[in-house]
Regions:
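PAS/LOV and related PAS-like sensory modules
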Residues: 1-18, 109
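PAS/PAC sensory module
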Residues: 8, 74-80, 86-90, 101
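N-terminal capping loop/helix in small sensory signaling domains highlighted by a polar->aromatic N-x2-3-F motif
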Residues: 27-34
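Alpha-helical sensory/transduction surfaces in regulatory modules that relay environmental signals to outputs
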Residues: 37, 44-46, 50-53, 68
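Soluble sensory domains of the PAS superfamily and closely related sensory modules
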Residues: 57-76, 84
């Protein structure tokens, strides 16, 4: 099944600063596929922020995730993730305002 038609692997709630910029996100839903890709058990992600789970995490994803959460836009992101040492393709859409749902595909670098 094409990634764009699969159910979300995770749903994240964006955290914004007083200027309205995305500064972090909280894992509100994660499935087994997400845990496999991230190499972290679901229970260690749920309810925690990205930077709690990945303290040295890259902020490059935040702008796109915030755009989805605030404006309802859709994005397809392609980039290397050093946190998991994989090349990721992430299909993002807004399930409801303030949230970003992601469907992930991972390949080895």
């Amino acid at each position: 099944m094409p990634a764009a038609y699969r159910p979300a692997d995770c749903i994240i709630e964006l955290v914004f600063n007083e200027d309205g910029h995305g500064v972090d996100f909280i894992f509100r839903y994660c499935n087994a596929e997400m845990a496999t890709i991230e190499g972290v058990p679901v229970e260690e992600m749920l309810g925690r922020s990205f930077y709690e789970v990945f303290p040295n995490g890259d902020k490059k994803w935040l702008v796109s995730y915030a755009d989805v959460a605030l404006n309802g836009t859709k994005h397809i992101l392609h980039d290397y993730s050093p946190e998991v040492d994989k090349c990721l393709t992430i299909h993002c859409y807004q399930p409801e305002p303030g949230y970003c749902a992601c469907v992930l595909q991972a390949t080895d670098p």
